[in-house]
Amino acid sequence: MAMDKKGDLEWMPPRPEPVHWRNRQRSLAYSVTLTLVALFFTFALRPEAFPSFLVRKGLHKSPLEQVLTRVPLTDGHNDFAIWTRAFYQNHIYRANFTDHDELYGQVDFPRLRKGRLGAQFWSVYVECARNPNEPGVQYEIVRDTFQQIDLVHRMINHFPDFLVPASSVADVHHNFYHSPGRISSLLGIEGLHQIGGSASVLRMYHELGVRYASLTHTCHNEYADSEAPEEPRHGGLSTAGEAIVAEMNRMGMIVDLSHTSLATQRAVFNVTRAPVMYSHSSAYALCPHSRNVPDDLLQMLKENDGIVMISLYPEYTNCQDADAASLADVADHIQYVGNLIGYRHVGLGSDFDGMSHGPKGLEDVSKYPDLIQELLDRGVSVDDLVGVTGGNVLRVLGDVEHVARSLADTLPLEDDVKPFFE
């Protein structure tokens, strides 16, 4: 049955009494004020209640805190392990080696925490042999390397409030979010003289957490030439070296070019299927030392999508006067490489405890935030510094893992062994 307009209106709810617009404005302002006060006390008393998307973006934090909380601060090279061998004979259960005292050197647990470190590639370095052809020398180097790997594992187990194991990008990110304040601990060897001429040994190192291998240290080996001796042995990478690079690609181990000759570096860029790293090197253009990377090789690194992790070693930082090397000089190297090939390819590789002293302002591991603040003050963006302080090297590690997965059907490199029966 149809209804007239009057009938339709009778079904509508009564119209409310008019509210003066000034009263409505006061009411709205009062409500907003109460809401803001409630939010302030909620977030002040319970910071975890802050909206997750703002926490992820770090919009409520200073630029320095945004950098340090978006990614684990990751150092590509630290010699704490060999320092512990040299000065404590690898004894970490004695009263003079604790997690609450300052240890001799540039690294200890209180200073690591103050420096806000989130992940570390601990070098399990063993020096080159003075007489490499003497019987038993290669065995001793491999044994000593296993002792250094074991040392880091024992440190992780004995100091769990500070260290946590990691062997992948996923581990590092998981630890960063679920074990805050603990340092994800990965390993790196510093020269293929440490593998005793055996791909099998290199694979065992990988099983124990070694995620990068420098092709050389300060000596040539059967795989590659170092930058240190004047006379090259192979003219770069040997045939065996090409095979070992392919094996590292297959197993998911980063190829590290620090300490290698320029010819070795160029050869590696031509054969590797994965991004590479310089774990602790700087810009040759600013300090023309053979340990640093020239511009043309930085361009090759960009094409490879790899990373150079800027060293703090004074002799590689300020070639005019190493004793005058400073935090500002290190920042210059970071900016130079970032401006030349992009900050995507820059990281931090301190070499703490591998040098007699650090640059002024970067004397020990507690000083990382000062370097980050200097770069912020110079106008480097938060996003770029998130990459420099950890995002870039973790991206490289992730890419290396991806290449390894793509090579899963490739057979491992086998050692040639002597016939058992002759």
From Swiss-Prot:
Cofactors that this protein relies on: Zn(2+)
Enzyme category, top tier: hydrolase
Signal peptide start and end residues: none
Transmembrane segments: 28-45
Covalent S-S links between cysteines: 128-219, 287-319
EC number, UniProt record: 3.4.13.19
Annotated binding of Zn(2+), by residue: 77, 79, 190
Database matches in SUPFAM superfamilies: Metallo-dependent hydrolases
Glycosylation site positions: 96, 270
Keywords from the UniProt entry: Dipeptidase, Disulfide bond, Glycoprotein, Hydrolase, Membrane, Metal-binding, Metalloprotease, Protease, Transmembrane, Transmembrane helix, Zinc
Positions of substrate binding: 217, 291, 351
Catalyzed reactions: an L-aminoacyl-L-amino acid + H2O = 2 an L-alpha-amino acid
Pfam families (alphabetical): Peptidase_M19
GO cellular component: membrane
Membrane topology qualifier: Single-pass membrane protein
UniProt-listed InterPro entries: Metal_Hydrolase, Pept_M19
Pathway assignment: Mycotoxin biosynthesis
GO BP annotations, alphabetical order: proteolysis
Compartments (UniProt record): Membrane
Purpose: Dipeptidase; part of the gene cluster that mediates the biosynthesis of aspirochlorine (or antibiotic A30641), an unusual halogenated spiro compound with distinctive antifungal properties due to selective inhibition of protein biosynthesis, and which is also active against bacteria, viruses, and murine tumor cells. The non-ribosomal peptide synthetase (NRPS) aclP is responsible the formation of the diketopiperazine (DKP) core from the condensation of 2 phenylalanine residues.
PANTHER family in the record: DIPEPTIDASE, MICROSOMAL DIPEPTIDASE
Family of this protein: Belongs to the metallo-dependent hydrolases superfamily. Peptidase M19 family.
Full protein name: Dipeptidase aclJ
